[in-house]
Amino acid sequence: MLALTRRRGEEIVIIDKETGEEMVIAVLRQMQHETRIGIEASPRFEIFRREVLERKRATDPA
């Protein structure tokens, strides 16, 4: 189960409550007085996201 999103320096991180695993989902970039957010689209994040969704479906009596 995803717990919370928090900011760690210039990174935005999600944390899996069950495993404590942290995953960077965005990186803040300062560009000419503007802050840009770049989303991480790494295969590792996609695998993590799928695993979390599968666990949620398995435990959610919907």
Stretches found by the model and what they are:
Residues M1-A62:
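Compact, glycine-rich, soluble single-domain proteins
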